[in-house]
Amino acid sequence: MAMSSYMVNSKYVDPKFPPCEEYSQNNYIPEQGSDYYSSSQDTDFQHPGIYPRSNYTEQPFGCTAVQEPTVPRGHVHDKSGQPSPFNAQTESGAPVLVAGPRTCGQQQNTKSQNGTQAKQPAVVYPWMKKVHVTTVNPDYTGSEPKRSRTAYTRQQVLELEKEFHFNRYLTRRRRIEIAHTLCLSERQIKIWFQNRRMKWTKDHKLPNTKGRSAPASSHLQSIHKDQTDITSL
Protein backbone atom coordinates (compact mmCIF):
# COMPACT_ATOMS: atom_id res chain seq x y z
CA MET A 1 0.00 0.00 0.00
CA ALA A 2 2.84 2.39 0.86
CA MET A 3 4.69 1.50 -2.33
CA SER A 4 1.65 2.27 -4.53
CA SER A 5 1.09 5.66 -2.87
CA TYR A 6 4.73 6.53 -3.40
CA MET A 7 4.51 5.72 -7.10
CA VAL A 8 1.40 7.87 -7.49
CA ASN A 9 2.68 10.92 -5.56
CA SER A 10 6.21 10.82 -6.95
CA LYS A 11 7.25 13.49 -9.48
CA TYR A 12 9.63 11.18 -11.34
CA VAL A 13 8.94 8.79 -14.16
CA ASP A 14 8.33 5.22 -13.15
CA PRO A 15 11.48 3.28 -14.17
CA LYS A 16 11.32 -0.11 -15.76
CA PHE A 17 12.56 -2.76 -13.33
CA PRO A 18 12.63 -6.50 -13.63
CA PRO A 19 9.95 -8.45 -11.83
CA CYS A 20 9.81 -7.79 -8.12
CA GLU A 21 9.95 -11.45 -7.21
CA GLU A 22 13.68 -11.69 -7.98
CA TYR A 23 14.48 -8.62 -5.92
CA SER A 24 12.34 -9.73 -3.04
CA GLN A 25 14.03 -13.14 -2.96
CA ASN A 26 17.56 -11.69 -3.07
CA ASN A 27 16.72 -8.85 -0.65
CA TYR A 28 17.81 -6.24 -3.16
CA ILE A 29 15.13 -3.78 -2.08
CA PRO A 30 15.68 -2.66 1.49
CA GLU A 31 12.68 -1.93 3.60
CA GLN A 32 12.18 1.76 4.14
CA GLY A 33 10.63 3.23 7.18
CA SER A 34 7.57 5.34 7.45
CA ASP A 35 9.68 8.51 7.70
CA TYR A 36 10.91 8.06 4.16
CA TYR A 37 7.44 8.01 2.65
CA SER A 38 6.16 10.78 4.88
CA SER A 39 8.96 13.14 3.79
CA SER A 40 8.12 12.64 0.09
CA GLN A 41 4.47 13.18 0.78
CA ASP A 42 5.11 16.46 2.63
CA THR A 43 6.68 18.02 -0.46
CA ASP A 44 3.34 18.09 -2.31
CA PHE A 45 1.11 18.49 0.70
CA GLN A 46 0.18 22.00 1.83
CA HIS A 47 -0.66 22.51 5.45
CA PRO A 48 -4.05 24.10 5.95
CA GLY A 49 -2.72 26.44 8.60
CA ILE A 50 -0.06 27.97 6.35
CA TYR A 51 -2.20 28.18 3.19
CA PRO A 52 -5.78 28.75 4.26
CA ARG A 53 -8.52 28.01 1.73
CA SER A 54 -10.43 31.03 0.48
CA ASN A 55 -14.18 31.07 0.94
CA TYR A 56 -15.19 30.94 -2.75
CA THR A 57 -18.84 30.47 -3.65
CA GLU A 58 -19.55 28.90 -7.00
CA GLN A 59 -22.35 30.53 -8.98
CA PRO A 60 -24.20 28.45 -11.57
CA PHE A 61 -24.73 29.74 -15.09
CA GLY A 62 -28.38 29.83 -16.17
CA CYS A 63 -31.14 32.02 -17.59
CA THR A 64 -31.79 33.74 -14.25
CA ALA A 65 -29.32 34.48 -11.44
CA VAL A 66 -30.31 31.95 -8.80
CA GLN A 67 -27.87 31.47 -5.96
CA GLU A 68 -27.52 27.95 -4.70
CA PRO A 69 -26.03 27.03 -1.34
CA THR A 70 -22.42 26.02 -1.50
CA VAL A 71 -21.73 22.35 -1.15
CA PRO A 72 -18.37 21.04 0.01
CA ARG A 73 -16.40 19.08 -2.50
CA GLY A 74 -16.95 15.37 -2.54
CA HIS A 75 -20.61 15.65 -1.55
CA VAL A 76 -23.65 15.40 -3.77
CA HIS A 77 -26.41 17.98 -3.38
CA ASP A 78 -29.96 16.83 -4.02
CA LYS A 79 -31.79 19.29 -6.28
CA SER A 80 -35.11 17.47 -6.34
CA GLY A 81 -36.62 19.67 -3.64
CA GLN A 82 -35.66 22.97 -5.34
CA PRO A 83 -37.56 23.85 -8.54
CA SER A 84 -35.52 24.90 -11.54
CA PRO A 85 -36.08 28.37 -13.03
CA PHE A 86 -36.70 26.89 -16.51
CA ASN A 87 -39.56 24.74 -15.25
CA ALA A 88 -41.05 27.73 -13.42
CA GLN A 89 -41.04 29.80 -16.61
CA THR A 90 -42.68 27.08 -18.67
CA GLU A 91 -45.37 26.52 -16.04
CA SER A 92 -46.20 30.20 -15.50
CA GLY A 93 -45.95 31.45 -19.09
CA ALA A 94 -46.88 30.11 -22.51
CA PRO A 95 -45.31 26.84 -23.63
CA VAL A 96 -41.99 27.26 -25.35
CA LEU A 97 -41.89 25.73 -28.82
CA VAL A 98 -38.49 24.51 -29.89
CA ALA A 99 -38.10 24.11 -33.64
CA GLY A 100 -36.28 20.86 -34.20
CA PRO A 101 -34.51 19.82 -37.38
CA ARG A 102 -36.77 19.12 -40.32
CA THR A 103 -36.96 15.67 -41.73
CA CYS A 104 -36.50 14.83 -45.40
CA GLY A 105 -40.24 14.37 -45.90
CA GLN A 106 -41.05 17.82 -44.50
CA GLN A 107 -38.43 19.46 -46.71
CA GLN A 108 -39.83 17.73 -49.79
CA ASN A 109 -43.36 18.82 -48.87
CA THR A 110 -42.28 22.45 -48.52
CA LYS A 111 -40.49 22.28 -51.88
CA SER A 112 -43.56 20.79 -53.57
CA GLN A 113 -45.82 23.47 -52.09
CA ASN A 114 -43.50 26.21 -53.30
CA GLY A 115 -43.40 24.61 -56.75
CA THR A 116 -47.20 24.43 -57.01
CA GLN A 117 -47.58 28.03 -55.92
CA ALA A 118 -44.98 29.27 -58.40
CA LYS A 119 -46.43 27.23 -61.27
CA GLN A 120 -49.07 29.17 -63.20
CA PRO A 121 -51.95 27.57 -65.09
CA ALA A 122 -51.33 27.01 -68.78
CA VAL A 123 -53.08 29.37 -71.18
CA VAL A 124 -55.35 27.62 -73.71
CA TYR A 125 -55.85 29.66 -76.86
CA PRO A 126 -58.91 29.25 -79.12
CA TRP A 127 -56.88 27.68 -81.91
CA MET A 128 -55.68 24.99 -79.47
CA LYS A 129 -59.21 23.80 -78.78
CA LYS A 130 -60.59 20.98 -80.89
CA VAL A 131 -64.18 21.20 -82.07
CA HIS A 132 -66.06 17.96 -81.50
CA VAL A 133 -69.28 16.91 -83.26
CA THR A 134 -72.06 16.81 -80.69
CA THR A 135 -74.55 14.85 -82.78
CA VAL A 136 -73.79 11.41 -84.20
CA ASN A 137 -74.43 11.08 -87.94
CA PRO A 138 -74.87 7.44 -89.07
CA ASP A 139 -74.05 8.38 -92.69
CA TYR A 140 -70.75 10.01 -91.74
CA THR A 141 -67.95 8.55 -93.88
CA GLY A 142 -65.03 10.27 -92.17
CA SER A 143 -64.54 13.09 -94.68
CA GLU A 144 -65.05 16.75 -93.88
CA PRO A 145 -68.66 17.93 -94.11
CA LYS A 146 -69.51 20.00 -97.16
CA ARG A 147 -70.13 23.68 -96.72
CA SER A 148 -73.64 24.82 -97.23
CA ARG A 149 -74.25 26.93 -100.35
CA THR A 150 -74.98 30.60 -99.85
CA ALA A 151 -78.49 31.61 -100.85
CA TYR A 152 -78.17 35.13 -102.28
CA THR A 153 -81.19 37.37 -102.27
CA ARG A 154 -82.45 39.13 -105.40
CA GLN A 155 -81.15 42.45 -104.15
CA GLN A 156 -77.67 41.00 -103.55
CA VAL A 157 -77.56 39.31 -106.97
CA LEU A 158 -78.68 42.55 -108.67
CA GLU A 159 -75.93 44.58 -107.01
CA LEU A 160 -73.30 41.93 -107.85
CA GLU A 161 -74.39 41.80 -111.49
CA LYS A 162 -74.14 45.58 -111.76
CA GLU A 163 -70.62 45.50 -110.33
CA PHE A 164 -69.59 42.63 -112.63
CA HIS A 165 -70.86 44.56 -115.65
CA PHE A 166 -68.36 47.35 -114.98
CA ASN A 167 -65.49 45.38 -113.38
CA ARG A 168 -65.00 41.64 -113.80
CA TYR A 169 -62.06 41.71 -111.39
CA LEU A 170 -62.28 43.41 -108.03
CA THR A 171 -59.57 44.87 -105.88
CA ARG A 172 -59.45 43.92 -102.24
CA ARG A 173 -60.55 47.37 -101.18
CA ARG A 174 -63.59 47.29 -103.48
CA ARG A 175 -64.41 43.75 -102.35
CA ILE A 176 -64.45 44.88 -98.71
CA GLU A 177 -66.79 47.76 -99.57
CA ILE A 178 -69.25 45.51 -101.41
CA ALA A 179 -69.17 42.90 -98.63
CA HIS A 180 -69.93 45.60 -96.07
CA THR A 181 -72.78 47.02 -98.18
CA LEU A 182 -74.46 43.67 -98.95
CA CYS A 183 -73.80 42.15 -95.48
CA LEU A 184 -71.68 39.36 -96.94
CA SER A 185 -68.15 38.13 -96.30
CA GLU A 186 -65.17 38.75 -98.54
CA ARG A 187 -64.95 35.07 -99.28
CA GLN A 188 -68.55 34.95 -100.51
CA ILE A 189 -67.94 37.94 -102.82
CA LYS A 190 -64.75 36.34 -104.15
CA ILE A 191 -66.43 33.00 -104.89
CA TRP A 192 -69.39 34.66 -106.59
CA PHE A 193 -67.13 36.62 -108.96
CA GLN A 194 -65.10 33.48 -109.76
CA ASN A 195 -68.24 31.56 -110.70
CA ARG A 196 -69.59 34.52 -112.67
CA ARG A 197 -66.38 34.83 -114.72
CA MET A 198 -66.46 31.11 -115.56
CA LYS A 199 -70.08 31.44 -116.69
CA TRP A 200 -69.27 34.52 -118.78
CA THR A 201 -66.34 32.71 -120.48
CA LYS A 202 -68.55 29.71 -121.26
CA ASP A 203 -71.33 31.88 -122.70
CA HIS A 204 -69.04 33.85 -124.98
CA LYS A 205 -66.92 30.83 -126.01
CA LEU A 206 -63.63 32.66 -126.35
CA PRO A 207 -61.00 30.92 -128.47
CA ASN A 208 -58.17 29.20 -126.68
CA THR A 209 -55.07 31.38 -126.77
CA LYS A 210 -52.80 28.40 -126.17
CA GLY A 211 -54.11 26.66 -129.30
CA ARG A 212 -53.45 29.72 -131.45
CA SER A 213 -49.92 30.19 -130.16
CA ALA A 214 -48.88 26.67 -131.15
CA PRO A 215 -49.30 27.02 -134.96
CA ALA A 216 -47.74 30.47 -134.93
CA SER A 217 -44.64 29.12 -133.25
CA SER A 218 -44.40 26.26 -135.75
CA HIS A 219 -44.71 28.73 -138.64
CA LEU A 220 -41.87 30.82 -137.25
CA GLN A 221 -39.72 27.74 -136.88
CA SER A 222 -40.27 26.79 -140.55
CA ILE A 223 -39.33 30.30 -141.71
CA HIS A 224 -36.16 30.23 -139.63
CA LYS A 225 -35.27 26.84 -141.14
CA ASP A 226 -35.68 28.13 -144.67
CA GLN A 227 -33.42 31.07 -143.92
CA THR A 228 -30.70 28.79 -142.62
CA ASP A 229 -30.92 26.64 -145.75
CA ILE A 230 -30.52 29.68 -147.99
CA THR A 231 -27.47 30.91 -146.12
CA SER A 232 -25.87 27.50 -146.34
CA LEU A 233 -26.10 27.55 -150.13
Swiss-Prot record:
Stored Gene3D superfamilies: Homeodomain-like (1.10.10.60)
GO MF term set: DNA-binding transcription factor activity, RNA polymerase II-specific; RNA polymerase II cis-regulatory region sequence-specific DNA binding
Locations listed in the record: Nucleus
Keywords: Developmental protein, DNA-binding, Homeobox, Nucleus, Transcription, Transcription regulation
Broad class of the protein's primary localization: nucleus
Start-end of DNA-binding region: 145-204
GO process annotations (BP): anterior/posterior pattern specification; embryonic skeletal system morphogenesis; positive regulation of transcription by RNA polymerase II
Biased composition (Basic and acidic residues): 223-233
Motif stretch (Antp-type hexapeptide): 124-129
Region feature (Disordered): 203-233
GO cellular component, as recorded: nucleoplasm
SMART domains noted in UniProt: HOX
Function (record text): Sequence-specific transcription factor which is part of a developmental regulatory system that provides cells with specific positional identities on the anterior-posterior axis.
Family: Belongs to the Antp homeobox family. Deformed subfamily.
Protein's name in the database: Homeobox protein Hox-D4a
Organism this protein belongs to: Takifugu rubripes
Lineage of producing organism: Eukaryota, Metazoa, Chordata, Craniata, Vertebrata
Gene behind the chain: hoxd4a
